A protein has these predicted regions:
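Flexible, low-complexity linker and terminal segments
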Residues: 1-166
């Protein structure tokens, strides 16, 4: 995991230090050394990079023309919209992310497999922007709605249907 040994607070003969200041990689003492800071930043990133997350799973039509992508509390509405689209004769699938950092290892492979990918977010598109930074050559459509309310399935179906027609 890359985690260092921690003395359990109260263990006799051990000193326990907590706080937000940068520590020396060698001693654990507070350090303002730029090289140490660089090394500790790389160490923290390696811990994140080594987290094992499951592969991304796609639900819906395996031969979909449109992949709908979401995360968080949008799952039910997006799945309902994808199911309705498939029932209406469209070919749609859903990839709902549970892990964003690190991303599932198969993220780029999944997103690049589909003719069209739409990222549905209840914000201004931070996830789509993140993927554009992380995945070279990715082409994404966006559905962004910031109303403080859940997505309306009918709105999603209408938007996704028009997107397939383009």
């Amino acid at each position: 995991t890359g985690a260092r040994y921690w003395a359990v607070p109260g263990t006799e003969g051990f000193m326990h230090r907590i706080g937000g200041l940068e520590k020396s990689a060698a001693t654990g003492a507070i350090s303002n050394d730029p090289e140490n800071h660089h090394q500790m930043t790389l160490t923290r990133q390696a811990k994140v990079d080594n987290i094992k997350v499951p592969d991304l799973v796609v639900e819906g039509n395996p031969d979909a023309d449109l992949l709908v992508v979401g995360f968080g509390g949008t799952y039910g509405h997006l799945l309902s919209a994808v199911n309705e689209m498939n029932a209406n004769g469209n070919k749609a699938a859903l990839a709902h992310f549970k892990y964003l950092n690190p991303l599932p290892k198969n993220t780029a492979e999944v997103l690049k497999k589909y003719k069209k990918v739409v990222v549905a977010e209840q914000n201004l598109g931070q996830l789509a922007a993140y993927w554009r930074m992380k995945i070279e050559g990715i082409k994404l459509e966006q559905f962004n709605e910031v109303k403080g309310q859940p997505f309306a399935t009918s709105t999603l179906v209408n938007y996704f249907t028009e997107l397939i027609k383009k």
